[in-house]
Amino acid sequence: SASQIKGPTIQEYDQEGVVAPYNIDSVAKSEGWDNLLDPMIAAIHKCENNSGPYCAAPVNIHRIDWMWANKAVFDNNGISVPTSWDELNAAAEKLQAAGIIPFAHGGQAWQDATVFEAVAMGIGGNNYYKNCYVDLKENCLRSDTTVKVFDQMRKLQGFTDEGSPGRDWNVATGMVIEGKAGFQIMGDWAKGEFTAAGKVPGVD
């Protein structure tokens, strides 16, 4: 039998002795998974404290730092897709002045964390993110970059609407699809909402 579970949970299953014999390891070796997978992804799928044989196969990997935008809303307001936080802020201010909700967001803890990761990575980069939020280095947490990250979060909060607190992510996605809001920062799974609504990338 097989099951689909989140990567880190595999280790808990293994520690309880409920993972089947590591037969998949022979496939991993013959197919060269160590050379194909990012080391972090590979480790998640190895049992015996992430360093033993493969005991699971990656079937999907999500990314959470996507920006989804309504092209018509942007085009009608003379806005190009932003490529920096300054450009995004300027676009949001323009939408706000036109009476359009710039940032569709659901004020739930996991959604706030999703946006925070995108901002932290976008402003500070990989090394900053690892030093601050993985290794918890105090000098990083107290850095000017951290101040910039929280300042950008404050700005984004100002671009949401009064209905944001508690809103489900797919409702926020629907606001972008329907042209009620300009953009959303959400994982790649939001694509399903756009696809179900018949929207075409680069067109809608």
Predicted feature locations:
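Alpha-to-beta junction loops
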Residues: 1-3, 99-102, 178-186
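Hinge/lid segment of periplasmic solute-binding proteins
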Residues: 6-64, 89, 115-117
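Short, solvent-exposed loop/beta-turn-alpha elements that line the ligand-binding surface or hinge
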Residues: 23-39, 80, 123-148, 196-201
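Extracytoplasmic/periplasmic substrate-recognition and gating elements
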Residues: 64, 72, 76-77, 151, ...
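Short helix-initiation/N-cap motifs at beta->coil->alpha
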Residues: 85-89, 164-177
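Glycine-centered hinge/linker elements that transmit conformational signals in sensory
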Residues: 92-95, 134-166, 204
